[in-house]
Amino acid sequence: SDVYKRQTLERAIEGLKCETAVHICYGYGIKANTDWKKTLGSEWRQYEEAFPKLQKSSIDIVSLECHNSRVPMDLIELIRGKKVMVGAIDVASNTLETPEEVANTLRKALQFVDADKLYPCTNCGMAPLPRHVARGKLQALSAGAEIVRRELSNPY
């Protein structure tokens, strides 16, 4: 039940004195996951149900897959006020994002997340990726985040 899920999440962080985070994952780019994702339709609206519950939880940070995800970005509005790790790097592909692609993902998220609560990150872990690909993706993440930081600090 939904009450049980929230109680389980609260119990997991009980007594912790640090910031807490939950990562909502659609899985790595392995064949079983990519096949499953194809069955989910053109929009993944499951967050519509989960986000209001997360909004009421004691969790401080919500980590989301945003780049190349089919989750509508506007659903992030349902967790406004939480810190949000915005996944701007697709870990299910060896294709390197450009800094501008990263910046575009972050700009979209900024419509629903206050700038001081947005944490640019990857969609998930990069363990399955070749090291040179992971390094290139992290460089794009850093450069894309820097583009947006400059825009926010100098809006003219």
Q: What are the language-model segments listed below?
A:
Residues L9-A12, L75:
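Intrinsically disordered, low-complexity boundary segments flanking structured domains
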Residues K31-T34, L129:
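Short, solvent-exposed polar/charged micro-motifs at secondary-structure junctions
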Residues R6-L9, W36, L40-E43, F51, ...:
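Structured aminoacyl-transfer and RNA-binding surfaces used for tRNA recognition/handling
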Residues C18-K31:
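Aromatic-lined carbohydrate-recognition surfaces of secreted/lumenal glycan-active proteins
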Residues R11, G15-A21, G41, D60, ...:
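A contiguous, surface-oriented mixed alpha/beta subdomain in the mid-to-C-terminal portion of proteins
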Residues D2-Y4:
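Short, small-residue-biased leader/transition segments that mark boundaries at the very start
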Residues N33-R45, S93-T98:
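Active-site mouth loops of central-metabolism enzymes
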